[in-house]
Amino acid sequence: MKRIAFLTPYKHLPNFKKNVESKYKCLDLSDLTELEQKYSIQTSDYLFSAPNYQKFQITDDFIKNTKISMVVSPSTGTNHIDVSIPVISIKNDKVLENIWSTAEHNLYLMLSLPRNTKNIVELHEKALGILGYGRLGKMIEHICKPIFKNVYTSDINYTDSQFFNETDFLSINVDLRDENIGMIDSEYISKFQK
């Protein structure tokens, strides 16, 4: 039976856990340090890693002298993985259309922001700007429209006319690729009126 080393938690997903444990020998290494994980993956065939729990980048050095032939990540980005072996990512997969956890986490962070400032604000009086209007941006718009006074969007080929004038909170949902690095700089921030 093939072995999967889980560098990040997976047991909180009962259906996934049941399915994967019926097909593979699963090693839960999520509570170990990076060094302990590196030592423990020696006999595994695959690695599983979710970026929101991982505190380091998986590199060729990390998997050197192991049997690891593939890295699996339940994520749309792979900036936490830099290896020469195959990486399976679910970016643009239809299964993502019904997974709202990242959008909900984004909302949670937005809800916590006003509570961590000296000036308490009510979101129903504020405008949300969504930078990046792909799958995640559309989900955020859907769950935030009932909460914010207005929601404005901006993407590669379109920006709402009031986006820079009215945005109080900015949700950044662009993918990590070379052309987006440095996109949010002082010049970009200076476009906002509030």
Residue ranges and their predicted role:
Residues 1, 124-127, 194:
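Phosphate-coordination loops involved in phosphoryl transfer and adenosine-cofactor binding
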Residues 40-46, 66-69, 165-170, 193-194:
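Short acidic/histidine-rich motifs immediately flanking catalytic phosphotransfer sites
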Residues 1-46, 150:
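N-terminal glycine-/charge-rich "phosphate-binding" loop or analogous flexible N-terminal tail
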Residues 113-140:
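Glycine-rich NAD(P)-binding loop of Rossmann-like domains
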Residues 45-118:
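Phosphate/diphosphate ligand-binding glycine-rich loop within oxidoreductases
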Residues 146-160:
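NAD(P)-binding Rossmann-fold cofactor-contacting core
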Residues 55-62, 156-194:
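Rossmann-like adenosine-cofactor binding region
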Residues 143-144, 192:
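Aromatic pocket-lining residues of Rossmann-like dinucleotide-binding sites
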